[in-house]
């Protein structure tokens, strides 16, 4: 079961700079449409196809910035069509549940980036629940970025998603990620592409440069802003980020956290007995904390909390009631079974070694 940690505080809404209108080449069989402002997202009902030349490698120019309140250009802009709202949490809860494997994959992609690349981007995969969006997987997407333009290999992104669907058919495209501490004008153009693949996509930023001394992780969703009939802008609204773990992921995270106290940042794998001992020590510390809290409540040092009391009562009721003699009998039986398995394994190993020597004679 995934156990969320303390939510990361969401920063205030960040208006993104909106680049100028970006022409995108259309397929040969379809006449080129009138250029529209880059801030107007494309409807989700028109995803990019493999036969579309623009989907192979999209190169979009972004020469300057246009404020969201700027006057309309000379030509009549295309009407802004907001994408459909992401089903589930975003009308209310606005919660993104992030698994640690996502962060590890993003950091690994950043460390392996091409020489001269300022940041890396990629696609976020996961599932949509009733009250939250759970990001469980991701993959990086090659792109080239300069001051004037950004080019994204959309065909590579589509092929990678098709491969992921064969392994995890329930995972959907939820949005995209980028390394860095801020949202650039090119982020609006990339976000427009992902609006075709997912309704109201998520934009996740991971500060791999550790600008504030820590790896800041933020999630946003885009919102159109402006006067109807004028050039529309985009505002990125922050979302609440929580961390979720599977049991296997939690073991890896606990092991990685131990490297914080190692001078060389390296730690070896512990044996099964050491893991059992560590788990027992953690349980003992937790029980000591619970007992101290109960004593403080009884002595009047701490006011009683009904929520904590109900939780402790539920925890106590889950403990099975076993007679000490029966428990000792079950423990001895399990120990005897373990000793028998160990004896048979050693006997089999000896027989195999003896057989090899007889064959070599």
Curated annotation (Swiss-Prot):
EC number: 3.4.19.12
Catalytic activity: Thiol-dependent hydrolysis of ester, thioester, amide, peptide and isopeptide bonds formed by the C-terminal Gly of ubiquitin (a 76-residue protein attached to proteins as an intracellular targeting signal)
Gene3D superfamilies cross-referenced by the UniProt entry: Cytidine Deaminase, domain 2
Biological process according to GO: formation of cytoplasmic translation initiation complex; proteolysis; translational initiation
PTM annotation (Phosphoserine): residues: 50, 262
N6-acetyllysine PTM sites in chain numbering: 242
GO molecular function list: cysteine-type deubiquitinase activity; metallopeptidase activity; translation initiation factor activity; translation initiation factor binding
Pfam families given in the database record: JAB, MitMem_reg
Residues in MPN domain copies: 96-226
Modified residues (N-acetylalanine): 2
Feature: compositional bias, Pro residues: 9-20, 30-40
Residue segments, region Disordered: 1-86
Compartments reported by the entry: Cytoplasm
GO CC entries: eukaryotic 43S preinitiation complex; eukaryotic 48S preinitiation complex; eukaryotic translation initiation factor 3 complex; eukaryotic translation initiation factor 3 complex, eIF3m
Quaternary data: Component of the eukaryotic translation initiation factor 3 (eIF-3) complex, which is composed of 13 subunits: EIF3A, EIF3B, EIF3C, EIF3D, EIF3E, EIF3F, EIF3G, EIF3H, EIF3I, EIF3J, EIF3K, EIF3L and EIF3M. The eIF-3 complex appears to include 3 stable modules: module A is composed of EIF3A, EIF3B, EIF3G and EIF3I; module B is composed of EIF3F, EIF3H, and EIF3M; and module C is composed of EIF3C, EIF3D, EIF3E, EIF3K and EIF3L. EIF3C of module C binds EIF3B of module A and EIF3H of module B, thereby linking the three modules. EIF3J is a labile subunit that binds to the eIF-3 complex via EIF3B.
Family statement drawn from the similarity comment of this UniProt entry: Belongs to the eIF-3 subunit F family.
Domain notes: The MPN domain mediates deubiquitinating activity.
Name the UniProt record assigns to this protein: Eukaryotic translation initiation factor 3 subunit F
Organism: Pan troglodytes
